[in-house]
Amino acid sequence: MADQENSPLHTVGFDARFPQQNQTKHCWQSYVDYHKCVNMKGEDFAPCKVFWKTYNALCPLDWIEKWDDQREKGIFAGDINSD
């Protein structure tokens, strides 16, 4: 999403699934959850935006760009299809 560069920074709230200081897994899971949510409910579904804000706050831009490219090519490792 192009809004990333214009949106204000914010701190992501606590998530009990990721109590460790290292938030790499939280970043990955939020990216996957966002795309799963969008595939099931559509981009305008407000709860999906929580995952979008989380992964944009936690994940390095290089990772996001790489994952976006992988999704476009159909080689993304995560399961983002609706179950």
Curated annotation (Swiss-Prot):
Residue ranges annotated as motif Cx10C motif: 48-59
GO biological process, one term: mitochondrial cytochrome c oxidase assembly
Subcellular locations according to the entry: Mitochondrion inner membrane
Keywords: Disulfide bond, Membrane, Mitochondrion, Mitochondrion inner membrane, Oxidoreductase, Phosphoprotein
Signal sequence, renumbered to the chain: none
Pathway(s) the chain acts in: Energy metabolism; oxidative phosphorylation
Domain CHCH: 24-67
Ranges spanned by the short sequence motif Cx9C motif, renumbered to the chain: 27-37
Pfam family for this entry, one: COX6B
A single MF term (Gene Ontology): oxidoreductase activity
Modified residues (Phosphoserine): S82
Disulfide bonds: C27-C59, C37-C48
UniProt miscellaneous comment: Present with 1390 molecules/cell in log phase SD medium.
Assembly and interaction partners: Component of the cytochrome c oxidase (complex IV, CIV), a multisubunit enzyme composed of 12 subunits. The complex is composed of a catalytic core of 3 subunits COX1, COX2 and COX3, encoded in the mitochondrial DNA, and 9 supernumerary subunits COX4, COX5A (or COX5B), COX6, COX7, COX8, COX9, COX12, COX13 and COX26, which are encoded in the nuclear genome.
Function: Component of the cytochrome c oxidase, the last enzyme in the mitochondrial electron transport chain which drives oxidative phosphorylation. The respiratory chain contains 3 multisubunit complexes succinate dehydrogenase (complex II, CII), ubiquinol-cytochrome c oxidoreductase (cytochrome b-c1 complex, complex III, CIII) and cytochrome c oxidase (complex IV, CIV), that cooperate to transfer electrons derived from NADH and succinate to molecular oxygen, creating an electrochemical gradient over the inner membrane that drives transmembrane transport and the ATP synthase.
Similarity field: Belongs to the cytochrome c oxidase subunit 6B family.
Name of the protein this chain belongs to: Cytochrome c oxidase subunit 12, mitochondrial
Species this protein is from: Saccharomyces cerevisiae (strain ATCC 204508 / S288c) (Baker's yeast)
This protein's encoding gene: COX12
